[in-house]
Amino acid sequence: MEKLGDDELGLIINWVHDHNDRRSISQVCKQWLRVEGQTRLYIRVLEAEVLHNFLPRFPNLVAFQASGLICNAHLECVAQTCPKIEVLNLNTRKMHDDLDESDELSGLNGGIHAIANGCRELRKVYLRRRGIGNFGVVSLLNFGKNLTELDLGRCNRITDQALEAIGYATSLCVLNLRCCWLITDSGLAMLANGSTARTLKKLIIAECERITDYGLSCLQQMCCLEELNLAECGPAVTDIGGVAVASIPTLKWLNLSWLINISDVTLTAIAEHSQKLTVLDLTGCELITGEGVRAFVDHESLEELVLVSCVNVFQSDVELLVLGSQSLKYIKLDKRLRMWIPIATQENISRFCRLDWTS
């Protein structure tokens, strides 16, 4: 029997999906080890310290993930070794205290610059909690012309300078700026006046407390925005900004959680103008009342509504909305309300949509 060529072996490898099986075979077949490395498209790195030892086996990776400690030198290695990477996922759940001093001062800006320069096919980049600053973001946008998703959540060094660069992106669809608390209305204006306004479908600016009504009014220029998260943007957001957001006709998903100066005025505007809206989260909006909730009785597309910690919304308002709506499928309420709503009423509501309770 003739020895299998690399092409034939590559076809066989594509049929072996279990990672344990792949690892077992690679331990007894050097050719398999080599070819499997060349055909691997995705890798998740648990210990970046040994990255230099094994990464050269995988020159054709298109997706790279590392949620643990990583430094600029590691990213430079990735950029040099794997130029075909399209998806870079460095999201982490916490900041690491044991960074090198140079990395602690600059975040991963140097490494991200190397990635942006070396991996020109980047489409999706996730950098949550990685301390990226303006230099890293500008590098990504200068080199990454195909970028569609960018997660900068909790990168609290980001300022309006980064948003100016993002505004020039021509293919960006998803942008997460959660808790980037240095950004202001000026940054949102640059986003709304740039090329991004014609492509962005999902924008998260939750916990950005320097945003005001003026910044939200700029978002009206985003012609295809479908998802908007404004949770905990602070008291500077009022009904003026809420009404402006309501005028975005493409909105399908809207989170207004804990905007304490949003009232029924905003809800009435949303019910009237946001005809494509399917999900609305009003958690902690203390000023809204049953009048605002009842405005959605005739809304034709609303499917999910969250009314947690809405102290001025009562049983009769919820019942009227659910029984009158033709589209509502899910409603979430405070658990404290449960004792005040008769069992018969709860059962009646549950006939038309799923009733969920939170503590």
Sequence positions of predicted segments:
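The N-terminal extracellular segments of secreted preproproteins, especially immediately downstream
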Residues: 28, 118, 172, 178-179, ...
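N-terminal adaptor-interaction module of cullin-RING ubiquitin ligase components
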Residues: 1-128, 133-141, 159-160, 164
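Solvent-exposed loop/turn tips at the surfaces of repeat/solenoid architectures
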Residues: 48, 66-69, 90-93, 130, ...
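Conserved long hydrophobic alpha-helices within structured protein cores
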Residues: 78-92, 178-188, 221-226
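C-terminal capping region of solenoid repeat domains
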Residues: 97-105, 109, 117-118, 142-143, ...
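Conserved beta-strand positions
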Residues: 45, 63-66, 90, 127, ...
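Alpha-helical scaffolds that organize eukaryotic protein assemblies
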Residues: 148-152, 157, 161, 167-168, ...
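Structural register of leucine-rich repeats
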Residues: 39-41, 62, 76, 85-89, ...
